C-alpha cells in the first residue's frame, strides 16, 4: 500500500517487438547494450571490414552513425555505415540543422537513405520499405521510444504514446496520489519531446510535490521551457548545435556539449 507513488519507469525502443531475436541487432536503450556492441565491433575490426546499418533518422540515429564512423576511424578499421533515416533526416528540426548533420555524415562516407525505413532484419540482411536489401554485420535500432505498457495494462488514463496522462503538477489526471516524470508520462497541457532536458527538470518538481502531497502543502506546476539547447555529438570531435535561431557546427560546439554533459554527470556521481 502507499499514500503517494512516483512512477518513473522510463521508456524503451520497441523495435524488437517486430524483429527476430538476433545477436547482431542492438537497440540504443538500455545503454549497456551499446557498450557490449562497442566491444564486439572493436574485436571484429581487427580482422575484417564491417557493414553496419543504423535505423532511425532522429538525433539518436545521427549520433550513433557519426560515432560508429569515428570509432572505426580511431581504430584504423574499415566500416561501411548506412543510416536509414525514415521519411527525412531530422524531420522534426529546421532544415539548417539537417543540412549541417547531413554534411558531417556524408563527408565522412556515411550513406544516408531518406524515404525508407527498416522493415525486417534476418540472416545478416536488412529489408527496407523501398524494396532495397542491405547486407550488414550489425544493426542499431534508434527508431524512437515508447513508455512501458504498465499504464495501459493498469487501466490508467494514457496519452497517444501510452504514457501515463498527467496534469501540470505531474499528477495522474485520474488518481491524484500518482505522480510521474520522464519518458513514461504524457503531459496533458501540451505534447513534450522525449528528451533528457525535460526529464531532468521534472525531478525537483516531483520531489516538491510528493512531499507536499503527504503534508497537505501547495503543489508546484511544471512549466516547460520554450526551447532547449540541441547539441549532436557527430563522433569526430565536432557537434551540430542549435540554440534558439542560432545554428552552427564544429569543434566549439562539441566543447560546449562536452562541458554541459560532464557537469551534469558529475552532479549525480555516487
Put a short name on every predicted segment.
Residues 162-179, 223, 236-247, 253:
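FAD-binding beta-loop-beta segment adjacent to the flavin cofactor pocket
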Residues 7-55, 59-74:
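Glycine-rich dinucleotide-binding loop and its adjacent helix/turn
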Residues 6-7, 140:
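N-terminal Rossmann-like NAD(P) cofactor-binding module of classical short-chain dehydrogenase/reductase
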Residues 10-13, 145-147, 237:
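Short glycine-rich anion-binding loops that position phosphate/pyrophosphate groups of nucleotides
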Residues 23-48, 133-204, 208-209:
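FAD-site-proximal beta/loop scaffold in flavoenzymes
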Residues 230, 236-270:
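C-terminal auxiliary extensions adjacent to catalytic cores
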Residues 70-168, 218:
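A Rossmann-like FAD-binding core segment of flavoenzymes
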Amino acid at each position: 500500500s502507499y499514500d503517494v507513488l512516483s512512477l518513473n519507469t522510463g521508456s524503451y525502443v520497441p523495435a524488437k517487438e517486430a524483429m527476430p531475436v538476433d545477436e547482431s541487432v542492438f537497440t540504443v536503450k538500455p545503454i549497456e547494450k551499446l557498450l557490449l556492441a562497442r566491444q564486439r565491433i572493436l574485436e571484429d575490426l581487427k580482422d575484417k571490414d564491417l557493414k553496419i546499418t543504423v535505423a532511425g533518422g532522429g538525433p539518436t540515429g545521427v549520433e550513433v552513425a557519426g560515432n560508429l564512423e569515428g570509432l572505426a576511424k580511431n581504430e584504423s578499421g574499415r566500416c561501411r555505415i548506412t543510416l536509414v533515416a525514415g521519411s527525412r533526416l531530422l524531420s522534426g528540426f529546421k532544415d539548417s540543422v539537417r543540412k549541417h548533420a547531413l554534411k558531417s555524415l556524408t563527408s565522412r562516407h556515411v550513406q544516408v537513405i531518406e524515404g525508407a525505413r527498416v522493415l525486417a532484419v534476418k540472416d545478416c540482411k536488412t529489408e527496407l520499405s523501398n524494396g532495397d536489401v542491405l547486407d550488414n554485420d550489425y544493426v542499431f535500432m534508434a527508431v524512437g521510444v515508447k513508455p512501458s505498457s504498465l499504464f495501459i495494462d493498469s487501466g490508467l488514463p494514457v496519452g497517444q504514446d501510452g504514457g501515463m496522462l498527467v496534469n501540470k503538477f505531474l499528477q495522474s489526471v485520474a488518481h491524484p496520489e500518482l505522480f510521474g516524470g520522464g519518458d513514461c508520462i504524457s503531459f496533458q497541457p501540451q505534447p513534450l519531446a522525449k528528451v533528457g532536458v525535460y526529464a531532468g527538470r521534472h525531478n525537483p518538481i516531483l520531489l516538491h510535490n510528493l512531499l507536499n502531497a503527504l503534508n497537505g502543502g501547495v503543489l508546484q506546476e511544471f512549466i516547460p521551457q520554450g526551447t532547449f539547447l540541441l547539441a549532436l555529438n557527430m563522433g569526430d570531435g565536432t557537434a551540430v548545435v542549435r540554440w534558439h535561431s542560432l545554428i552552427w557546427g564544429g569543434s566549439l560546439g562539441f566543447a560546449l556539449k562536452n562541458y554541459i554533459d560532464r557537469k551534469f554527470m558529475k552532479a549525480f556521481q555516487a
